[in-house]
Amino acid sequence: MKVTKADIVISAVKPEQYPDGDLPEIALAGRSNVGKSSFINKILNRKKLVRISSKPGKTQTLNFFLINEMMHFVDVPGYGYAKVSKTERAAWGKMIETYFTTREQLDAAVLVVDLRHKPTNDDVMMYDFLKHYDIPTIIIATKADKIPKGKWQKHLKVVKETLDIESGDEVVLFSSETGLGKEEAWKAIHKFTKTKNA
């Protein structure tokens, strides 16, 4: 998809701050510093729409981005960062749970994982959480450029087996450096949004 417009609409922490309307929403989740911001910037053809923080756990709000006036991307705060306090972690959990369980406009989630490494317990918990609430999920296995092409399938197998991916959920090989998987990611996203924009 050609992105001609992408703007941040609001940074929200509670439902009354979520944007009005019935545009489809895609939520983007992932471990702190997994490359989620780079994925969003790459897929939207923007260099700095989402700031890439050197400090993990920096984003503590749900950031809503309006794409081509057609859909919202919702950047979910990264999880699994050890230095976040218990209080902050509890607040994060409540905010995420409220959004994922009550937001009617939510059509699917994108879960960004690092292809180089076996998914963490936090990745597994996040995927299980999404599946518990029957949220269709697209797995973006990023940083494919960091490992030899001949090892991609082996690493993909580890990702699929560790997360115990359901048959309907797609896994897309991705690289924010080379753009690998960009078209495939959009195709997967459009499966969930096109019905509302047909």
UniProtKB/Swiss-Prot annotation:
Entry's family note: Belongs to the TRAFAC class TrmE-Era-EngA-EngB-Septin-like GTPase superfamily. EngB GTPase family.
Keywords noted in UniProt: Cell cycle, Cell division, GTP-binding, Magnesium, Metal-binding, Nucleotide-binding, Septation
Record: residues binding Mg(2+): S37, T59
Amino acids binding GTP: 30-37, 57-61, 75-78, 142-145, 174-176
An example molecular function term from Gene Ontology annotations: GTP binding
Superkingdom classification of source: Bacteria
PROSITE patterns, per database record: G_ENGB
Gene Ontology terms describing biological process: division septum assembly
InterPro entries listed in its UniProt record: G_ENGB_dom (IPR030393), GTP-bd (IPR006073), GTP-bd_ribosome_bio_YsxC (IPR019987), P-loop_NTPase (IPR027417), Small_GTP-bd (IPR005225)
GO terms under cellular component: cytosol
Source organism: Bacillus anthracis
Function: Necessary for normal cell division and for the maintenance of normal septation.
Domain EngB-type G: 22-195
Cofactor(s) required for function per UniProt: Mg(2+)
Record's protein name: Probable GTP-binding protein EngB
HAMAP family: GTPase_EngB (MF_00321)
Gene: engB
Segments passing through the bilayer: none
Lineage: Bacteria, Bacillati, Bacillota, Bacilli, Bacillales
